Amino acid sequence: METRLRYLIASGQVESRVVAPVPWFPLKGERFGHYGTLAKVPQRETRNDIDVTHPRYLVLPRVGMNVTPYTLAHAAKREIGRILDSGYDFDAIDAHYFYPDGVAAVMLGKYFNKPVVITARGTDINLIPQFARPRQLILDAARDADGIITVCKALKDEMVGLGVAPDNITPLRNGVDLERFAPLDRAAARAAVGLAPGRFTLLSVGLLDPRKAHDLIIRALPQLPDVDLLIAGIGPEKNNLERLARELNVQDRVKLLGSVPQTELKTYYNAADTLVLASSREGWANVLLESMACGTPVVASDVWGTPEVVAAPAAGVLMPQRTPEGLVAALSQLRANYPEHSATRRYAEDFGWQPTTQGQIDLFHSILARKAA
């Protein structure tokens, strides 16, 4: 989201203020889990020269999913009012994730009489509509939104299947920052992160939770004796992943890196031989293109928007099944026809941000023209 906005602002045709509400929680610290971490988020900050405010909204246990759009809208409403009172007017609300943010954005659009564009990104469409009340709120928001963006065609198809009018949905894929993620000297990168020479190294990047399926990769390792695995991310599955590696006697070949800043991820992408994404759900996984931009091919599960990213031999291979055996088969296929790193980089270069940026600008202009007519 931040990168997409940076490129949009860099076009010189858009300016923006960001209101990014976070749940209210009274105590700070990792021992309080996700909410304790969110409590440390500042009220205001500047990121890449973009002013961002983080008003707090109430999340209620047990009933939280159904009422969160309303508490989020209430918190954002006060902050948007302050922004308007400061003399900064705006033309449209650009919301990311349909639920709860997009639902709240439509409420705010009605209150402030501003058009609303909502971007669907993944679980907001392929998971949350399984719950009756959120599903209805999502459909209501989709009906009332002035424009809808999906980060892949698969999400548009899913929304149409839910009953959303296709004419109001514009697929605009995420791009990749080709300057931030670029090839390095691979031997130097491997040495920098301490990789053993001669070992084929997999990298898995993402939150340590069941949906990301890092465990599936670990379960494949007994069938891959010359392969090591690096996992970058934090989350509730850390202890379970470590335990699984010990049970399978592959603990010496699995290294959990913890949280890795984006500035350092480039080194890991260049050091690895393959990025593996075994997720059960993805809209458009940025890590795939980040890896390819560094010249490293991928092996990925054949879900949602991923086939739209991994669409040529230079990009990598899709797993025939989301199983350890499927991963082993895909890796065997990749290693038998391993692409040149330069070819993988060239493939990624077709996924820069400019087409997406222009697509957003065109969409905003068309919506504002309709409103003015």
Predicted regions and their residues:
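N-terminal subdomain of nucleotide-sugar transferases
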Residues: 1-48, 53, 355, 362, ...
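Short alpha-helical donor nucleotide-sugar binding micro-motif in glycosyltransferases
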Residues: 259-260, 267-272
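Conserved donor-binding/catalytic core segment of Leloir-type glycosyltransferases
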Residues: 196-212, 218-221, 230
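Donor nucleotide-sugar binding/catalytic pocket of nucleotide-sugar-dependent glycosyltransferases
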Residues: 17-24, 118, 134-186
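A short helix/loop element that forms part of the nucleotide-sugar donor recognition site in Leloir-type
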Residues: 36-41, 182-195, 341-343
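Aromatic "clamp/platform" in nucleotide-sugar-dependent glycosyltransferases that forms part
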Residues: 261, 280
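Conserved acidic donor-binding segment of nucleotide-sugar-dependent glycosyltransferases
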Residues: 312-313, 317-324, 333-338
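Short hydrophobic beta-strand element within catalytic cores of glycosyltransferases
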Residues: 297-301, 305
